[in-house]
Amino acid sequence: EELNSIQEFSSISELPGQKKYKFAIRGNPSLGNIKTLMIGVKNPSTQLGDALCGEVWFNELRISGIDSQDGWAAVGALDGNIADFATFSATGRYSSIGFGSIDMTPNERTREELLQYDIISNVNVGQLAPQKWGLQIPLSFATGETLITPEYDPFYQDIKLEDRLNTAERQSQRDSIRNQSIDYTKRKSVSLIGVRKNSSGGGKRRFYSPENFDFSYAYNESIHRDYEIEKQEEFNLLMGSNYGYSFSSKPIEPFKKVKSFDRKKYLQWLQQLNFNLLPSSLEASVNVNRILNNQKFRQVYLEGVDASLQRSLPNLQQRNFLFDYNYALNHNFSKSLRFNFNAATSSIIRNNGMAEAGVMNPFQQDKNALWQGILNTGEPNNHIQTFSLNYKLPFQYIPFLSFVDATYNYTGNFNWQRGSEALSQVVSDDGIPLGIVNTIQNNNTKTLTTAFSFSKLYSALGLKSNSNTPFNRRVQAARAVNDSLSKKKNSLLKVGLTKLVDLMTLVKRVQASYSENNGSVLPGYLPSVGFAGGLQPTLGYTLGSQADIRYEAARQGWLTGFPNFNQSFSQMHSSKFKASAQLIPMKGLIIDFNADRDFMENRLENFKVEGQSYVPRNSNVFGNFGMSTILLRTAFNPARGSESSNFENFRSYRLKIAERLVQNTPFEGMGVNEEGYPVGYGKSQQEVLLNSFLAAYTGENPNKIKLTPMRGTPLPNWNLKVTGLTDI
């Protein structure tokens, strides 16, 4: 029967019995993709509205004869070593089709055959050299393969792979079917990590000694193919070298042996003066990371399809060649003053540039391409350098200030980021290309941390507080003292002095810190950075200085003159102050005070460079401000029913605040609006609402409150803890 044109519900009278209809599916679908079966009933009536009555039975649809073929699996491992010279490890694994745990259903068992092995070996090649050389050469080699053969053909998922192979007419067909069905992965790696010369104890290590260096090398290779990917190759080359040396110089103390300072405690700080001429440590590292990836998707083989008529799929290649280096210098100028400098540069080796120079074929897919131009350091893509200075103020050497501990820290950061290659092709209306425009940014952080340990101060002054005595014992002691002192004339004076000492030693600890962060971002910067970093645009800028460099950079020709350049110059400033204090009047009673103030301001500005002159355009300033305050005066104000008296004050204060704000402004004398508020300062104006809220909830007079929310001094919050009630 011709099935090219099948009419739905076609009547087939030749079918035996009561089967009058035949349903068919056009094409060759895979039964493995069936998720749902639908059964329908056809209405045989040809007249609408006919009364119908029928009974339909659907027997249970069940799959019978499930193949519950069992499988097996095995795992093997072999470990060996040759003393401490070499180690060897090999593992193998096999599992057949149908393998699974005893509680798995037939459908949950594996539908593939797995064969896998891995071999790993480590050899300390340095032991082959004389021991006095002190060579450390750890060689590692690893290889492995994984072969996964499915039970069913990946394309015809309802046909077993073995059956399809048996029906193939030629050996070449069987090879093509088998090759596209098997999931195959091969791995190989060779590495030399931490090659170095250890100290043999023969002499003092110098900054140029070979013991300060170590070298690393690693090569990784992976080959993979499966049903979708005809071939995927990934080659990875890693090389690196590190240098590190710590100078062992003693600090110079010019006044340490001056004996006259020993008898004068206020001059003893001179004995502690010290400085170092040599840095503390010097570090550097270089890393090469090259990745080459070749991939080609598979053109699936099908019987009856001429492969020569199919459009070939392209080879995809991805290369990522990186060259990174960094260095660090640490110098303890003295025991209290420490200096650190770090710089890191990441470079990209451009493939196009190498092809133009004849170094590499840009379409070369062989792994030997990893070694082409190995000495090429590429073009800088990102440069970061950090400068930090830490100073511990010498209060501990001053007798009357020894209870103060203070530290100042300064950190300056500089970053150079290369511009986008894609955006460099943008052309203005006048035909001027944008080119490579870089971005520079810097910031600095200043932090001053201070702690006051009043227990040291009280001890130095000879004051001893009774606040550590439990409350009930103090009561008993006070009664005993009163009984004994009542017999003396100076009893009241002694009791008063005791109370005075307790009052003077209430404060146990005070801490305060202030930090400030400033930064700027300048886009459109044209110069690159040198191999060892950069000192442009100025030395101060690279160390975090916020001196304005925009006009000087434009005058020097360092900023792009592209007429359609629209990236913004930005500046940021933030400051944070925190303070805390702890009072302990008696044991079990602790009062903590905390105050803080935060301020942040950002400024964005568009600009244009005309004739090497910086021309600022529109700018935008925004920020945040927060400060602790005390609301104790209004926290317990009574409420009138569902109305809050503080909120009512807030509403009524708005007119008074608005009348004060309009003074000495262009809106003064312009009258009032329909609600009685001055023009420009309505009842919902931001400044009116903010100052009215502060006056209402802090309990201040709206006619006297400062009309600026950014006040200088924060008011502390407090927390009261009572833990000594059980001692009463």
Language-model-detected regions and their locations in the chain:
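Extracellular beta-strand ligand-recognition surfaces/modules
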Residues: 1-51
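Exposed, low-structure sequence patches enriched in small/polar residues
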Residues: 46-728
